[in-house]
Amino acid sequence: MLRIAIVGAGGRMGRNLIQAVQQTEGLSLMAAFEREGSSLIGTDVGELVGISPLGITISACLAEKTADFDVLIDFTRPEATLEYLKFCLANDKKIVIGTTGFDENGKQAIKQASQKIAIVFASNYSVGVNLVFKLLEKAAKVMGNYCDIEIIEAHHKHKVDAPSGTALSMGEHIAKTLGRDLKTDAVFERYGIMDERQTNQIGFATIRAGDIVGEHSVWFVDEGERVEISHKATSRMTFAKGAVCAAQWLANQPQGLFDMTNVLALDQL
């Protein structure tokens, strides 16, 4: 039985993760955490998600549960994730990271930690989105050098980072396939009078509105035609199930930094 702990348990993703773990054979939810001072501290996680009590209450202290779990699943914020990462590193725990919005220092900290512990770090845990990454690589090989490429993403109004980590990953997959650097090719803002678009640019557009779970569309545009590769998520359970799948896969891995390409064996396609 693989023992799971969840941080950010009271959030939208956290609640879906609790349900996903409970629905998955071979997994046992052993601990759930929220930030210090949260009104949810002491709440039974079963009652939190509308099922029967599970006898597991939300805590603020990981140290109290060190011996209780094998893999930590984290969908919080970068500053919190890096603290949880330090805990996992100090206690030889594996971690699935779904947090996005890290700066270069944060990404480097994750990379360094992976030299000692096993980590799955992905911008999106949807199976469909990760399949889209592969499709984008195929499209970029055929059309990327002569088409204009634009990435449009939409999320709920509470999402704080933009563009989404998934949109950036899409751009990175395309740029890498073309032998280019996204840092120099990306255009994140267009306003007012500006120079004519350059073919090497990869444009990003962001929408934040209502309760949109997550939508991404990539356009490859040439004179007279446009190819669109799109993905729409209608439930966060899609991401939760993917993260749980990643935790199961991670249980059999030594130290190292992995993503959903590894988990789903997409390189074999």
From Swiss-Prot:
NAD(+) binds at residues 8-13, 34, 98-100, 122-125. (S)-2,3,4,5-tetrahydrodipicolinate binds at residues 156, 165-166. The keyword NADP applies. It comes from the Bacteria. Pathway: Amino-acid biosynthesis; L-lysine biosynthesis via DAP pathway; (S)-tetrahydrodipicolinate from L-aspartate: step 4/4. Keywords: Amino-acid biosynthesis, Cytoplasm, Diaminopimelate biosynthesis, Lysine biosynthesis, NAD, NADP, Oxidoreductase. PROSITE patterns: DAPB. It catalyses: (S)-2,3,4,5-tetrahydrodipicolinate + NAD(+) + H2O = (2S,4S)-4-hydroxy-2,3,4,5-tetrahydrodipicolinate + NADH + H(+); (S)-2,3,4,5-tetrahydrodipicolinate + NADP(+) + H2O = (2S,4S)-4-hydroxy-2,3,4,5-tetrahydrodipicolinate + NADPH + H(+). GO terms for cellular component: cytosol. It is an enzyme of class 1 (oxidoreductase). InterPro entries: DapB_C (IPR022663), DapB_N (IPR000846), DapB_N_CS (IPR022664), DHDPR_bac (IPR023940), NAD(P)-bd_dom_sf (IPR036291). Its EC number is 1.17.1.8. It is found in: Cytoplasm. Gene3D superfamilies: Dihydrodipicolinate Reductase, domain 2, NAD(P)-binding Rossmann-like Domain. The keyword Oxidoreductase applies. Its main location: cytoplasm. The active site is at residues 155, 159. GO terms for biological process: diaminopimelate biosynthetic process; lysine biosynthetic process via diaminopimelate. Belongs to the DapB family. Catalyzes the conversion of 4-hydroxy-tetrahydrodipicolinate (HTPA) to tetrahydrodipicolinate. This is 4-hydroxy-tetrahydrodipicolinate reductase. The lineage of its organism: Bacteria, Pseudomonadati, Pseudomonadota, Gammaproteobacteria, Pasteurellales. The gene is dapB.
